Amino acid sequence: MNTATGVIALLVLATVIGCIEAEDTRADLQGGEAAEKVFRRSPTCIPSGQPCPYNENCCSQSCTFKENETGNTVKRCD
């Protein structure tokens, strides 16, 4: 088996595996197990001290104006 044949075989294998995984995470309109796989995310709240562009999504549920290291006033999660 030469290099080109090996590369083609790996591409075919990757495509087959990708199709199998895509089937496993197909959208489930009833909100079942497949939907949980598709919408699996990391925590969405913003930790304390980080900039908060909106008054929501802070882990503390509070966002206030604070002075940063350059002297500008920015909104940060409490």
Curated annotation (Swiss-Prot):
It comes from the Eukaryota. GO terms for cellular component: extracellular region. Its main location: secreted. It is found in: Secreted. Residues 1-22 form the signal peptide. GO terms for molecular function: calcium channel inhibitor activity; sodium channel regulator activity; toxin activity. The record marks 51, 68, 76 as: Critical for insecticidal activity. The keyword Disulfide bond applies. Coiled coil: none annotated. Residues 23-41 form a propeptide. GO terms for biological process: defense response. Keywords: Calcium channel impairing toxin, Cleavage on pair of basic residues, Disulfide bond, Ion channel impairing toxin, Knottin, Neurotoxin, Secreted, Signal, Toxin, Voltage-gated calcium channel impairing toxin, Voltage-gated sodium channel impairing toxin. Disulfide bonds join 45-59, 52-63, 58-77. Transmembrane segments: none annotated. Expressed by the venom gland. It holds the Pfam family Omega-toxin. Insecticidal toxin that reversibly and voltage-independently blocks both mid-low- (M-LVA) and high-voltage-activated (HVA) calcium channels (Cav) in cockroach DUM neurons. Also causes a modest block of insect sodium channel currents (Nav). Induces potent excitatory symptoms, followed by flaccid paralysis leading to death in house crickets. This toxin comes from a male specimen. It is observed that propeptide sequences coming from male specimen are identical but have only limited homology with the female paralogs, but the reason is unknown. The presence of a 'disulfide through disulfide knot' structurally defines this protein as a knottin. Belongs to the neurotoxin 08 (Shiva) family. 01 (omega toxin) subfamily. This is Omega-hexatoxin-Ar1f. It comes from Atrax robustus.
